[in-house]
Amino acid sequence: MKITRFKILLSGSLGVLLTFLFLDSPAQTVTLQHVTIFQEKISLGSGEIAAAEMLSEEVGKRTGAKWPVSVTWPASGDVIVLKKASAKTKLPFSISVAPELAKKSESYRILNVQHQNQKVIIIEGVDDRGVLFGTGYLLRTMQYKENSVGLDQLPSMASSPDKYMRGHQLGYRNTANSWDAWTKQEFEQYVRDLVVFGTNSIESIPIFDESVSPHFKVKPDEMNAFISKVCQKYSLDYWMWIPAQFDLKDTALRNKYLGTFEEICKQSVRINGVFFPGGDPGDNPPELVIPLLQDLAAILKKYHPKASTWVSLQGFTPAQSQYVYKYIQDKMPVWLGGLITGPSSPTVEETRAVLPAKYKLRHYPDLTHSVRCEFEIPWWDPSFSLTLGREAINPRPDHYSAIYHALDPYIDGFISYSDGVHDDVNKIIWTALAWDRKADIRNILQEYSNYFFASSVTEEAADGILALEKNWQGPIVSNGSIATTLTAWKALEKANPSLDNNWRWQMNLLRAYYDAYTRGRYIYETQLQRQVNEKFLEAASIGADAAMKEANNILAKAETQRVMTEIRTHIIDLCEALYKSVSLQTSVKKYQASGLERGSVLDFLDRPLNNRWWLEDEFKKIQSLPEKDKVKALEVIANWEKVGPGSYYDEVGNVGKSVHEMKGEDWRMDPILRKNFNPGYDFSDDGLSRKRLSWLTYMRWPIAMEYGNIDTSARYTVKVNGMGECLLKINGQRVAPSRYGRGYGEIKEFPVPQALVQQGKLVLTWDAIDEDFLNWRKQSRVTEVWLIKEQ
């Protein structure tokens, strides 16, 4: 006989009893009605009190059912018990000792008991956080309907966290793309949402050179003090990120900084940790940083004796990092809680290997950015980097799961870097994995969808989120699943109008529509570009000026004859809806986002995905030339990517146009992209550069370019475009240039020695050049490579 699965139904007084049939079993339900949350006032921790309030309020929001919190056992109705294991709670029955409750902090177990006519669920924590997180588990696994809550029958279960630190930085500052416009109530709600999935640490930014935002509803000092109180209420660790954005040799500024820090310590009801970044921002050597940390630690201990001081090595040179390592090994400072790894810092492997065991290692993962960041999207199609950019809505459950597992063996926990709600899914993924590294990603997303959307869309929405990540994999033009993803989200949108004002729902819809619109535009504007190139080749017969005029008319169709206009309108409407629902600022002009790189996807909605802007500028240069030279210039543009038989063109770094470029290991094998160097994506002119698009995607140096089945009797030339220097090798042999331009469009040419051609295969590699002394924007790079067979 098959095992029967039950459905528990928790109903309010107006609830309707439903029955469910599972497998071949007769219809059976276990019904909990008129639910009371039982919690005796016996040495209650703040987390326990918050758990009861959270359970009652969140169930009420989703169902309308009212679950009172009582200190006395109800005479009737069903009961959810919240208790610490150590509390002498008076229950009218005995509870099982199995499963065993772990002694590890934050652990909990959940039991089901039948008491007379009452169905009872017991959430027992080893401490008040255990009660809180056990309650969170119940909330995210219950199935919600009007006036009732269904729950798959829970076996007796127990759970403990893998990592002791699971947190997120929520800096109340103008740089943020959403929560700088929140009220205190909205801020607390978001913290509570994170708590439901296991977050136990929140980090604020109380000292930063950014005191004003056009969106602030609360003064920064007041909001940061409030966040500390929220952490106290939910028994969470409260951290502060406190960079020093000045020269530490300046005694006056140093004293002012320490004075500000002391005032913050006085105002904060709770502080558990302080994070001082070595750099990003800040530019001080460790010889000056360490004495400052000692002073900070002394002030911190004065007001919060159990708090600890931490430092990252971000921005330090290798020698400076070694200085810090040696200092710790020699001095073993008691004020130091541990080190922090993150963007622009030594690897977790290096730091863990040299850090004495008594010190913890926290990671500071960038969950918020997609490009020009710590964890870039592998080989992102340039059409997305040009439009969605660095800080778009970015659910990446599979990739961030792989990243977590790569770092997991080395870290004691994490508090992430985030600058808005757009990375909400990534926060939940890392939090859930830090509780249970074996957690299934789809199951996490099902709980996410169930809790934040509706139980009726749990499966479909979870799969829809997974599909959004797939939208960003591979060339945009050949990724037909982008259209399928939009179809799925359209169906969900139509079937669930009650979710229209749900900001998490709106974010997923925006991405689905935006991705599809971008793909449609790319296909359309590429066709327009082809028509323009054909027109250029007619210049000799119709005249160069006429060809350019007609080309302008063709290019203008991107605006005068738009494609997918209904989708475009809906994208604009969703951006407006998100601003109203969660203050997401998708435009600098319209919504006063802090910058074009800060989630301003609406400002790039119609950014050309062909070379329209570059061509407009080229036409101005060409106009002054003699007719013969005009025609020649237009022919060069028309044939830019067009090569003859046996010749090849690659746009280096463009996943859809670099067939000869060798890539490294797949991100599933190399999630941090240490062996698969990722392309660079130029953001000059605030992302509105008018350069040729092929010059905006680049590799510092490609791993290699490979060409097989070479005609051994022919002569070949390698042409390279890019910026700066180029130390080219062919089949391992350094080759000399016959032409050596250093700017964009100023081609370098390297004749291929005939002895190498006769090998039948050509492999191009580049010797690295040390340019660390240059800003990355000025460092050498490769954007295009041609292998030209002389005809």
Per-range role (PLM):
Residues 3, 7-10, 15-116, 151:
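Acidic, contiguous N-terminal accessory segments
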Residues 45-47, 89-92, 131-132, 175-179, ...:
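Short, solvent-exposed loop/turn elements at domain surfaces
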Residues 51-54, 58-60, 100-252, 266-270, ...:
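Feature activates predominantly on carbohydrate-active enzymes
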Residues 629-713, 772-791:
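Glycan-recognition and processing domains
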Residues 694-713, 721-790:
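Beta-strand-rich ligand-recognition modules
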